[in-house]
Curated annotation (Swiss-Prot):
Similarity comment: Belongs to the sugar phosphate cyclases superfamily. Dehydroquinate synthase family.
UniProt main location, coarse: cytoplasm
GO BP terms, alphabetized: amino acid biosynthetic process; aromatic amino acid family biosynthetic process; chorismate biosynthetic process
Keyword Metal-binding set for record: yes
The protein's name: 3-dehydroquinate synthase
UniProt keyword annotations, A-Z: Amino-acid biosynthesis, Aromatic amino acid biosynthesis, Cobalt, Cytoplasm, Lyase, Metal-binding, NAD, Nucleotide-binding, Zinc
Pathway the protein contributes to: Metabolic intermediate biosynthesis; chorismate biosynthesis; chorismate from D-erythrose 4-phosphate and phosphoenolpyruvate: step 2/7
Originating species: Hyphomonas neptunium (strain ATCC 15444)
PANTHER family tied to this protein: 3-DEHYDROQUINATE SYNTHASE, 3-DEHYDROQUINATE SYNTHASE, CHLOROPLASTIC
Cross-referenced InterPro entries: Dehydroquinate_synthase, DHQ_synth_AroB, DHQ_synth_fam, DHQS/DOIS_N, DHQS_C
Pfam families named among the record's database cross-references: DHQ_synthase, DHQS_C
Record's GO cellular component terms: cytoplasm
Length: 373
Protein backbone atom coordinates (compact mmCIF):
# COMPACT_ATOMS: atom_id res chain seq x y z
CA UNK A 1 0.00 0.00 0.00
CA UNK A 2 1.20 3.48 -0.85
CA UNK A 3 0.21 6.13 1.65
CA UNK A 4 -0.58 9.70 0.63
CA UNK A 5 -2.62 11.08 3.50
CA UNK A 6 -5.55 11.21 3.59
CA UNK A 7 -5.68 8.67 0.73
CA UNK A 8 -4.06 5.29 0.31
CA UNK A 9 -3.39 3.57 -2.99
CA UNK A 10 -3.61 -0.20 -3.21
CA UNK A 11 -2.31 -1.75 -6.43
CA UNK A 12 -3.88 -4.91 -7.85
CA UNK A 13 -0.99 -6.49 -9.73
CA UNK A 14 -2.34 -8.23 -12.82
CA UNK A 15 0.29 -7.43 -15.42
CA UNK A 16 -1.13 -5.34 -18.25
CA UNK A 17 -4.51 -5.31 -16.49
CA UNK A 18 -3.20 -3.98 -13.16
CA UNK A 19 -5.21 -1.21 -11.55
CA UNK A 20 -5.32 1.06 -8.53
CA UNK A 21 -7.75 1.20 -5.62
CA UNK A 22 -7.86 4.68 -4.11
CA UNK A 23 -9.05 4.61 -0.49
CA UNK A 24 -9.97 7.35 1.93
CA UNK A 25 -12.20 10.27 2.85
CA UNK A 26 -12.57 12.40 -0.30
CA UNK A 27 -11.14 9.88 -2.77
CA UNK A 28 -13.95 10.71 -5.20
CA UNK A 29 -12.08 13.92 -6.08
CA UNK A 30 -9.58 11.76 -7.98
CA UNK A 31 -12.20 10.36 -10.36
CA UNK A 32 -12.21 13.21 -12.87
CA UNK A 33 -8.43 13.34 -13.44
CA UNK A 34 -8.14 9.54 -13.56
CA UNK A 35 -11.14 9.10 -15.84
CA UNK A 36 -10.00 11.74 -18.30
CA UNK A 37 -6.85 9.69 -18.91
CA UNK A 38 -8.93 6.63 -19.84
CA UNK A 39 -11.60 8.11 -22.07
CA UNK A 40 -11.40 8.54 -25.82
CA UNK A 41 -14.24 11.06 -25.67
CA UNK A 42 -15.46 13.18 -22.74
CA UNK A 43 -18.45 11.11 -21.67
CA UNK A 44 -19.09 8.05 -19.54
CA UNK A 45 -22.05 5.89 -18.58
CA UNK A 46 -23.09 5.57 -14.93
CA UNK A 47 -25.09 2.65 -13.57
CA UNK A 48 -26.50 3.25 -10.11
CA UNK A 49 -29.56 2.60 -8.00
CA UNK A 50 -32.29 5.01 -7.00
CA UNK A 51 -31.09 5.35 -3.41
CA UNK A 52 -27.48 6.12 -4.34
CA UNK A 53 -28.61 8.57 -7.02
CA UNK A 54 -30.72 10.42 -4.49
CA UNK A 55 -27.83 10.78 -2.03
CA UNK A 56 -24.74 11.04 -4.21
CA UNK A 57 -25.50 11.90 -7.86
CA UNK A 58 -24.48 15.52 -7.39
CA UNK A 59 -21.18 14.47 -5.79
CA UNK A 60 -20.26 12.28 -8.74
CA UNK A 61 -21.22 14.97 -11.24
CA UNK A 62 -19.08 17.47 -9.33
CA UNK A 63 -16.13 15.06 -9.28
CA UNK A 64 -15.93 14.97 -13.09
CA UNK A 65 -17.10 18.51 -13.88
CA UNK A 66 -13.63 20.07 -13.98
CA UNK A 67 -12.54 17.35 -16.41
CA UNK A 68 -15.42 18.26 -18.73
CA UNK A 69 -16.88 14.75 -18.69
CA UNK A 70 -20.57 14.29 -19.46
CA UNK A 71 -22.34 11.47 -17.63
CA UNK A 72 -25.26 9.38 -18.93
CA UNK A 73 -27.20 7.85 -16.01
CA UNK A 74 -29.32 4.76 -15.46
CA UNK A 75 -30.86 4.20 -12.02
CA UNK A 76 -32.21 0.78 -11.05
CA UNK A 77 -34.35 -0.23 -8.07
CA UNK A 78 -32.20 -0.98 -5.01
CA UNK A 79 -31.87 -4.49 -3.60
CA UNK A 80 -30.69 -7.99 -4.44
CA UNK A 81 -33.72 -8.75 -6.64
CA UNK A 82 -32.35 -6.25 -9.17
CA UNK A 83 -29.44 -8.63 -9.91
CA UNK A 84 -31.42 -10.53 -12.55
CA UNK A 85 -31.35 -11.42 -16.24
CA UNK A 86 -34.22 -9.06 -17.01
CA UNK A 87 -32.46 -6.09 -15.43
CA UNK A 88 -29.19 -7.03 -17.13
CA UNK A 89 -30.94 -6.98 -20.50
CA UNK A 90 -32.27 -3.52 -19.69
CA UNK A 91 -28.78 -2.25 -18.85
CA UNK A 92 -27.38 -3.58 -22.12
CA UNK A 93 -30.23 -2.03 -24.09
CA UNK A 94 -29.59 1.33 -22.40
CA UNK A 95 -25.90 1.15 -23.35
CA UNK A 96 -26.69 0.23 -26.95
CA UNK A 97 -29.31 2.95 -27.24
CA UNK A 98 -26.75 5.43 -25.93
CA UNK A 99 -24.25 4.48 -28.61
CA UNK A 100 -21.74 2.88 -26.25
CA UNK A 101 -18.73 1.24 -27.83
CA UNK A 102 -15.64 -0.58 -26.61
CA UNK A 103 -13.79 2.68 -26.13
CA UNK A 104 -16.35 3.96 -23.64
CA UNK A 105 -16.40 3.43 -19.89
CA UNK A 106 -19.19 2.25 -17.60
CA UNK A 107 -19.01 3.44 -14.00
CA UNK A 108 -20.70 1.22 -11.41
CA UNK A 109 -21.77 3.68 -8.71
CA UNK A 110 -23.37 1.74 -5.89
CA UNK A 111 -23.12 -1.37 -3.78
CA UNK A 112 -22.39 -4.97 -4.67
CA UNK A 113 -25.52 -5.46 -6.75
CA UNK A 114 -24.70 -2.51 -9.00
CA UNK A 115 -21.03 -3.50 -9.18
CA UNK A 116 -21.81 -7.09 -10.14
CA UNK A 117 -24.42 -6.03 -12.70
CA UNK A 118 -22.25 -3.27 -14.12
CA UNK A 119 -19.21 -5.49 -14.45
CA UNK A 120 -21.13 -8.21 -16.25
CA UNK A 121 -22.77 -5.67 -18.56
CA UNK A 122 -19.38 -4.10 -19.33
CA UNK A 123 -17.88 -7.52 -20.09
CA UNK A 124 -20.70 -8.34 -22.51
CA UNK A 125 -20.97 -4.96 -24.21
CA UNK A 126 -19.36 -5.49 -27.61
CA UNK A 127 -17.12 -8.09 -25.92
CA UNK A 128 -15.81 -5.64 -23.38
CA UNK A 129 -15.94 -1.91 -22.64
CA UNK A 130 -14.07 0.07 -20.01
CA UNK A 131 -15.23 -0.41 -16.43
CA UNK A 132 -14.70 1.63 -13.26
CA UNK A 133 -15.98 0.82 -9.77
CA UNK A 134 -17.07 3.56 -7.37
CA UNK A 135 -18.50 1.49 -4.50
CA UNK A 136 -20.81 3.26 -2.06
CA UNK A 137 -21.25 0.55 0.58
CA UNK A 138 -18.66 -0.74 3.01
CA UNK A 139 -19.20 -4.28 1.77
CA UNK A 140 -18.55 -3.30 -1.83
CA UNK A 141 -15.51 -1.20 -0.94
CA UNK A 142 -13.73 -4.06 0.81
CA UNK A 143 -14.93 -7.01 -1.24
CA UNK A 144 -17.09 -7.06 -4.34
CA UNK A 145 -15.53 -4.06 -6.12
CA UNK A 146 -12.08 -5.67 -6.09
CA UNK A 147 -11.07 -8.70 -8.09
CA UNK A 148 -13.29 -8.76 -11.16
CA UNK A 149 -16.09 -11.12 -10.17
CA UNK A 150 -19.36 -10.23 -11.91
CA UNK A 151 -22.67 -12.08 -11.91
CA UNK A 152 -26.44 -12.17 -11.79
CA UNK A 153 -28.63 -14.46 -9.72
CA UNK A 154 -31.09 -17.08 -10.93
CA UNK A 155 -33.94 -18.87 -9.12
CA UNK A 156 -31.53 -21.81 -8.74
CA UNK A 157 -28.96 -19.84 -6.80
CA UNK A 158 -26.82 -16.79 -6.29
CA UNK A 159 -24.10 -15.66 -8.71
CA UNK A 160 -24.43 -18.73 -10.93
CA UNK A 161 -24.21 -16.75 -14.20
CA UNK A 162 -21.19 -14.48 -14.43
CA UNK A 163 -17.66 -13.79 -15.60
CA UNK A 164 -14.32 -12.49 -14.39
CA UNK A 165 -13.88 -8.94 -15.68
CA UNK A 166 -11.48 -6.54 -13.98
CA UNK A 167 -12.16 -2.84 -13.53
CA UNK A 168 -9.59 -0.29 -14.63
CA UNK A 169 -9.93 1.72 -11.43
CA UNK A 170 -11.65 1.50 -8.04
CA UNK A 171 -12.47 4.61 -6.00
CA UNK A 172 -13.34 3.73 -2.38
CA UNK A 173 -14.35 7.05 -0.83
CA UNK A 174 -15.20 6.39 2.81
CA UNK A 175 -17.10 9.71 2.95
CA UNK A 176 -19.79 8.10 0.78
CA UNK A 177 -20.52 5.65 3.60
CA UNK A 178 -21.96 8.36 5.87
CA UNK A 179 -25.46 7.97 4.40
CA UNK A 180 -25.58 4.21 5.01
CA UNK A 181 -27.88 2.79 7.68
CA UNK A 182 -26.02 1.24 10.60
CA UNK A 183 -27.22 -2.19 9.50
CA UNK A 184 -25.57 -1.81 6.08
CA UNK A 185 -22.30 -0.78 7.72
CA UNK A 186 -22.38 -3.84 9.95
CA UNK A 187 -23.01 -6.06 6.92
CA UNK A 188 -19.91 -4.65 5.24
CA UNK A 189 -17.92 -4.97 8.43
CA UNK A 190 -18.46 -8.74 8.29
CA UNK A 191 -16.33 -8.88 5.14
CA UNK A 192 -13.59 -6.87 6.89
CA UNK A 193 -13.54 -9.38 9.74
CA UNK A 194 -13.26 -12.13 7.13
CA UNK A 195 -9.78 -10.98 6.10
CA UNK A 196 -8.56 -11.33 9.66
CA UNK A 197 -10.07 -14.78 9.94
CA UNK A 198 -8.53 -15.98 6.67
CA UNK A 199 -4.84 -15.25 7.22
CA UNK A 200 -4.29 -12.18 9.41
CA UNK A 201 -4.86 -12.88 13.09
CA UNK A 202 -3.21 -9.56 14.01
CA UNK A 203 -5.82 -7.69 11.96
CA UNK A 204 -8.59 -9.66 13.67
CA UNK A 205 -7.12 -8.64 17.04
CA UNK A 206 -7.02 -4.99 15.88
CA UNK A 207 -10.66 -5.21 14.82
CA UNK A 208 -11.68 -6.73 18.14
CA UNK A 209 -10.36 -3.52 19.76
CA UNK A 210 -11.14 -0.94 17.06
CA UNK A 211 -14.22 -2.33 15.33
CA UNK A 212 -16.55 0.26 16.82
CA UNK A 213 -14.33 3.05 15.46
CA UNK A 214 -14.63 1.53 12.00
CA UNK A 215 -18.40 1.27 12.32
CA UNK A 216 -18.52 4.90 13.51
CA UNK A 217 -16.59 5.82 10.33
CA UNK A 218 -13.80 7.55 12.18
CA UNK A 219 -11.69 8.59 9.16
CA UNK A 220 -8.36 7.06 10.17
CA UNK A 221 -9.87 3.79 11.37
CA UNK A 222 -12.16 3.47 8.36
CA UNK A 223 -9.37 4.19 5.90
CA UNK A 224 -7.03 1.73 7.60
CA UNK A 225 -9.62 -1.05 7.72
CA UNK A 226 -10.75 -0.58 4.12
CA UNK A 227 -7.21 -0.26 2.75
CA UNK A 228 -5.92 -3.28 4.69
CA UNK A 229 -8.89 -5.33 3.50
CA UNK A 230 -8.36 -4.25 -0.12
CA UNK A 231 -4.64 -5.02 0.12
CA UNK A 232 -5.41 -8.49 1.46
CA UNK A 233 -7.82 -9.19 -1.36
CA UNK A 234 -5.52 -7.64 -3.98
CA UNK A 235 -2.69 -9.96 -2.96
CA UNK A 236 -4.92 -13.02 -3.22
CA UNK A 237 -6.39 -11.93 -6.58
CA UNK A 238 -2.92 -11.27 -8.00
CA UNK A 239 -1.92 -14.82 -7.06
CA UNK A 240 -5.13 -16.55 -8.19
CA UNK A 241 -7.34 -14.37 -10.37
CA UNK A 242 -9.85 -17.02 -11.45
CA UNK A 243 -10.32 -18.83 -8.13
CA UNK A 244 -8.60 -22.13 -8.79
CA UNK A 245 -6.52 -22.04 -5.61
CA UNK A 246 -5.92 -19.57 -2.80
CA UNK A 247 -8.70 -17.20 -3.89
CA UNK A 248 -11.19 -19.79 -2.71
CA UNK A 249 -10.29 -18.71 0.83
CA UNK A 250 -12.24 -15.51 0.19
CA UNK A 251 -15.36 -17.68 0.24
CA UNK A 252 -15.08 -18.19 4.00
CA UNK A 253 -18.66 -18.14 5.25
CA UNK A 254 -20.09 -17.90 1.74
CA UNK A 255 -21.12 -21.51 1.11
CA UNK A 256 -23.29 -21.41 4.21
CA UNK A 257 -24.20 -17.79 3.56
CA UNK A 258 -25.36 -18.26 -0.02
CA UNK A 259 -27.57 -21.14 1.10
CA UNK A 260 -29.10 -18.93 3.78
CA UNK A 261 -29.78 -16.17 1.24
CA UNK A 262 -31.36 -18.59 -1.23
CA UNK A 263 -33.47 -20.19 1.52
CA UNK A 264 -34.64 -16.70 2.44
CA UNK A 265 -35.42 -15.95 -1.23
CA UNK A 266 -33.06 -12.94 -1.10
CA UNK A 267 -35.46 -10.97 1.08
CA UNK A 268 -34.17 -7.82 2.72
CA UNK A 269 -34.41 -9.19 6.26
CA UNK A 270 -31.08 -10.96 5.61
CA UNK A 271 -28.42 -8.87 3.89
CA UNK A 272 -25.50 -10.52 2.11
CA UNK A 273 -22.99 -9.40 4.72
CA UNK A 274 -25.25 -10.65 7.49
CA UNK A 275 -25.47 -14.02 5.75
CA UNK A 276 -21.67 -14.10 5.47
CA UNK A 277 -21.27 -13.27 9.17
CA UNK A 278 -23.67 -16.05 10.07
CA UNK A 279 -21.86 -18.36 7.65
CA UNK A 280 -18.46 -17.58 9.17
CA UNK A 281 -19.71 -18.19 12.69
CA UNK A 282 -21.17 -21.52 11.58
CA UNK A 283 -18.05 -22.48 9.61
CA UNK A 284 -15.94 -22.01 12.75
CA UNK A 285 -18.45 -23.90 14.89
CA UNK A 286 -18.71 -26.70 12.30
CA UNK A 287 -14.92 -26.86 12.33
CA UNK A 288 -14.96 -27.10 16.12
CA UNK A 289 -17.63 -29.82 16.02
CA UNK A 290 -15.47 -31.71 13.50
CA UNK A 291 -12.32 -31.47 15.62
CA UNK A 292 -10.60 -29.07 13.20
CA UNK A 293 -10.98 -25.67 14.85
CA UNK A 294 -10.12 -24.92 18.50
CA UNK A 295 -13.39 -24.45 20.35
CA UNK A 296 -12.02 -21.28 21.98
CA UNK A 297 -11.41 -19.72 18.56
CA UNK A 298 -14.90 -20.62 17.38
CA UNK A 299 -16.34 -19.03 20.51
CA UNK A 300 -14.24 -15.89 20.05
CA UNK A 301 -15.35 -15.47 16.42
CA UNK A 302 -18.96 -15.80 17.50
CA UNK A 303 -18.37 -13.26 20.28
CA UNK A 304 -16.64 -10.63 18.11
CA UNK A 305 -19.18 -10.86 15.30
CA UNK A 306 -22.09 -10.85 17.73
CA UNK A 307 -20.70 -7.82 19.58
CA UNK A 308 -20.86 -5.92 16.28
CA UNK A 309 -24.57 -6.62 16.03
CA UNK A 310 -24.24 -9.28 13.35
CA UNK A 311 -26.24 -12.54 13.33
CA UNK A 312 -24.30 -15.52 14.64
CA UNK A 313 -27.02 -18.16 15.03
CA UNK A 314 -30.08 -19.44 13.18
CA UNK A 315 -32.33 -18.50 16.07
CA UNK A 316 -35.26 -16.39 14.96
CA UNK A 317 -35.24 -17.40 11.29
CA UNK A 318 -38.26 -19.09 9.71
CA UNK A 319 -37.85 -22.80 10.63
CA UNK A 320 -39.61 -23.93 7.46
CA UNK A 321 -37.32 -21.94 5.18
CA UNK A 322 -34.21 -22.77 7.20
CA UNK A 323 -34.80 -26.49 7.74
CA UNK A 324 -31.51 -28.40 7.83
CA UNK A 325 -32.33 -30.64 4.86
CA UNK A 326 -33.37 -27.64 2.76
CA UNK A 327 -30.18 -25.76 3.58
CA UNK A 328 -28.04 -28.80 2.75
CA UNK A 329 -29.84 -29.20 -0.58
CA UNK A 330 -29.14 -25.55 -1.39
CA UNK A 331 -25.47 -26.02 -0.51
CA UNK A 332 -25.44 -28.85 -3.06
CA UNK A 333 -26.21 -26.14 -5.65
CA UNK A 334 -22.83 -24.53 -4.92
CA UNK A 335 -20.77 -24.15 -8.10
CA UNK A 336 -18.05 -26.41 -6.67
CA UNK A 337 -20.24 -29.15 -5.15
CA UNK A 338 -19.77 -32.72 -6.39
CA UNK A 339 -21.79 -35.87 -5.63
CA UNK A 340 -22.94 -35.17 -2.10
CA UNK A 341 -19.76 -33.41 -1.08
CA UNK A 342 -18.92 -29.73 -1.09
CA UNK A 343 -15.68 -27.84 -0.53
CA UNK A 344 -15.90 -25.66 2.57
CA UNK A 345 -13.53 -22.98 3.77
CA UNK A 346 -12.73 -24.01 7.32
CA UNK A 347 -10.04 -22.86 9.74
CA UNK A 348 -7.46 -24.49 11.96
CA UNK A 349 -7.69 -21.32 14.01
CA UNK A 350 -8.17 -17.58 13.65
CA UNK A 351 -6.02 -16.46 10.71
CA UNK A 352 -5.52 -20.03 9.51
CA UNK A 353 -8.25 -20.73 6.96
CA UNK A 354 -7.89 -23.50 4.40
CA UNK A 355 -9.92 -25.26 1.72
CA UNK A 356 -11.52 -28.42 3.10
CA UNK A 357 -12.07 -30.08 -0.28
CA UNK A 358 -14.83 -32.58 0.35
CA UNK A 359 -17.06 -31.92 3.33
CA UNK A 360 -19.80 -34.52 3.55
CA UNK A 361 -23.15 -32.78 3.15
CA UNK A 362 -24.78 -35.38 5.39
CA UNK A 363 -22.49 -34.31 8.24
CA UNK A 364 -23.17 -30.66 7.45
CA UNK A 365 -26.91 -31.37 7.59
CA UNK A 366 -26.55 -33.05 10.99
CA UNK A 367 -24.59 -30.04 12.24
CA UNK A 368 -27.24 -27.63 10.95
CA UNK A 369 -29.94 -29.69 12.63
CA UNK A 370 -28.06 -29.38 15.92
CA UNK A 371 -27.79 -25.60 15.43
CA UNK A 372 -31.53 -25.42 14.84
CA UNK A 373 -32.44 -27.60 17.81
Amino acid sequence: MKTSSPLETVRVELGARAYDILVGHGALSELGPRLSQMLKRPRAFVLTDETVARHHKDALEAAVKSAGIRLDWLSLPPGEKTKSFSQLEGVLDWLLAGGADRGDTLIAFGGGVIGDMGGLAASLMKRGMGFVQVPTTLLAQVDSSVGGKTAVNTPRGKNLIGAFYQPRLVIADTALLATLPARELKAGYAEIVKYGLINDAAFFDWLAVNGQKVLALEPEAARYAVARSCAAKAAIVAEDETETGVRQLLNLGHTFGHAFEAANEYRENLLHGEAVALGMALAFRYGAASGITPAADAARVTEVLGASGLPVSLEGFDPARFAADRLAALMQQDKKARAGRVPLILARGIGAAYVHPDADLASVERFLASELA
